[in-house]
Amino acid sequence: MDIRQMNKTHLEHWRGLRKQLWPGHPDDAHLADGEEILQADHLASFIAMADGVAIGFADASIRHDYVNGCDSSPVVFLEGIFVLPSFRQRGVAKQLIAAVQRWGTNKGCREMASDTSPENTISQKVHQALGFEETERVIFYRKRC
């Protein structure tokens, strides 16, 4: 297995994995996101490949705005991570996170952050297993003008 930063040849593999993580996201939106990731310097995606098959991915961004729970800027932000169920518990996510962290460090980041919803306890356990620490819980509100 190896981890590669996504390029145009990985786009279809990435889209297939991403659809499993976010099935409600339309196909054309996944493709538009992929094109943006390939062109933007502050975005990256990493693909885990095993025997020519994409088995996982991690999307990341460099954020310069305030990131909850962080003390520095910029921060590398894990936007999403997914590993095929048959490849979980084998260190794939750990290697994806290491690739994201190296990328962020090369971009001047000293911290990595991520988020998940309070009810997504599986994601919380995965984050903790990957070395993240919970910093705060936030509820967002809105009011229409």
UniProtKB/Swiss-Prot annotation:
PROSITE patterns to which the protein is assigned, alphabetical: GNAT
An individual GO BP term: response to antibiotic
Record-level Gene Ontology MF annotations: aminoglycoside 6'-N-acetyltransferase activity; protein homodimerization activity
Amino-acid positions noted as binding acetyl-CoA in the UniProt annotation, renumbered to this chain: 81-83, 89-94, 120
Pfam families xrefs: Acetyltransf_1 (PF00583)
Domain (N-acetyltransferase): residue spans on this chain: 1-145
Positions of substrate binding: 22, 25, 66, 79, 115, 136
Catalytic reactions of this protein: kanamycin B + acetyl-CoA = N(6')-acetylkanamycin B + CoA + H(+)
UniProt EC number: 2.3.1.82
Keywords, in A-Z order: Acyltransferase, Antibiotic resistance, Transferase
Acyltransferase is among the record's keywords: yes
Superkingdom of origin: Bacteria
InterPro entries the UniProt entry points to: Acyl_CoA_acyltransferase, Aminoglycoside_N6-AcTrfrase, Bact_Acetyltransf, GNAT_dom
Gene3D superfamilies: 3.40.630.30
Subunit structure: Homodimer.
The protein's role, per its UniProt record: Catalyzes the transfer of an acetyl group from acetyl-CoA to the 6'-amino group of aminoglycoside molecules conferring resistance to antibiotics containing the purpurosamine ring including amikacin, tobramycin, dibekacin and ribostamycin. Able to acetylate eukaryotic histone proteins.
Protein name from the UniProt record: Aminoglycoside N(6')-acetyltransferase type 1
Organism of this sequence: Salmonella enteritidis
